[in-house]
């Protein structure tokens, strides 16, 4: 009886293990790459480039410290973009959990001005602190997120128009510690439509949007808010 009980329990564990492995494999190789259709709203408002949770919304000068991730460690827009920008900027950060859609979409229509890849300073750090804070809604959502300074990223500049004025926006795809690649589907000089897919990041990651601040801009999102790529209006 005892041997039969042990054998039955072992069989249960085997079946459970197979189901767990099958579920993980489906998530990792099928569900993760899902690409639901998106329908950009009418108008010319700047759209979210990513699905996820907004972790910061700031309007600052490029070299001015935007956020403090730890005591004595501050981050500016220039640190995130890895360029020396000028004039006041709007910065919106979006954390993408492993369960969000990971295809990234253009905030506006325009021409690809540049696509630049920057390797990690040493190695990619995990985004566990930010993930936990977004789950618990524990502000500030960016605290202890050293990946903002450290990690690999691809910076795509899109040159378009906003309210009939020229506008260049930067979309920054920041890799997480478990990321297996940042994909870019566009090249410099090509055109992209508002809400169209231009790339993706594999597994958990972050996408930031940087645009020049202009009079009359209205920020439509706040930290902690959920957004959808190609559909949620960030700025009007």
Functional labels for PLM-detected ranges:
Residues 1-236:
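Contiguous, well-folded functional domains in the mature portion of proteins
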């Amino acid at each position: 009886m005892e041997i039969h009980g042990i054998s039955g329990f072992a069989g249960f564990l085997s079946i459970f293990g197979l189901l767990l492995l099958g579920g993980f494999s489906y998530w990792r190789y099928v569900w993760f790459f899902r690409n639901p259709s998106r329908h950009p709203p009418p108008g010319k408002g700047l759209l979210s480039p990513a699905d996820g949770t907004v972790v910061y919304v700031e309007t600052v000068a490029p070299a001015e410290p935007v956020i403090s991730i730890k005591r004595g460690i501050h981050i500016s827009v220039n640190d995130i973009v890895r360029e020396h920008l000028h004039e006041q900027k709007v910065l919106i950060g979006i954390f993408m959990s492993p369960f969000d859609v990971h295809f990234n979409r253009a905030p506006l229509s325009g021409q690809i001005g540049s696509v630049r890849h920057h390797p990690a300073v040493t190695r990619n750090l995990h985004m566990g602190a930010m993930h936990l804070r977004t789950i618990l809604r524990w502000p500030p959502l960016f605290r202890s997120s050293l990946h903002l300074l450290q990690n690999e990223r691809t910076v795509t500049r899109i040159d378009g128009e906003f309210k009939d004025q020229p506008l260049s926006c930067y979309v920054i795809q920041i890799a997480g510690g478990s990321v297996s690649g940042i994909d870019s589907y566009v090249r410099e000089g090509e055109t992209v439509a508002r809400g169209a897919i231009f790339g993706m990041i594999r597994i958990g990651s972050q996408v930031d949007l940087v645009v020049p601040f202009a009079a009359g801009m209205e920020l439509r999102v706040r930290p902690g808010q959920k957004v959808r790529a190609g559909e949620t209006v960030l700025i009007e």
